[in-house]
């Protein structure tokens, strides 16, 4: 796929995901938690789309290495977030 085609497809997909998030927020009667979950899902999909379509993550000689670095960074970030939440919940429950 050519670069112009990749950028066009990525741009249109980003707009569609954004409009879907706006639609879910404004025009559905879902609960706040459901809306938030859907919006975060769209956000993660759009972030992956940005990395693949615009940042050319998998292209070139170092494509696999770059992909591994991004996955490693996401795992470390997830460990920090989940670990912090776990410690904060544990500290909160021991003081009650």
Curated annotation (Swiss-Prot):
Listed EC numbers: 1.10.3.-
Presence of keyword Cell membrane: yes
Transmembrane stretches, start-end: 8-28, 36-56, 68-88
Any one of the GO BP annotations: electron transport coupled proton transport
One GO molecular-function entry: proton transmembrane transporter activity
Keyword Transmembrane helix: yes
Key words of the record: Cell membrane, Membrane, Oxidoreductase, Transmembrane, Transmembrane helix
Functional summary from the UniProt entry: Catalyzes quinol oxidation with the concomitant reduction of oxygen to water.
Protein family membership: Belongs to the cytochrome c oxidase bacterial subunit 4 family.
Protein name: Probable quinol oxidase subunit 4
Species annotation: Staphylococcus aureus (strain MRSA252)
Phylogenetic lineage: Bacteria, Bacillati, Bacillota, Bacilli, Bacillales
Gene name in the database record: qoxD
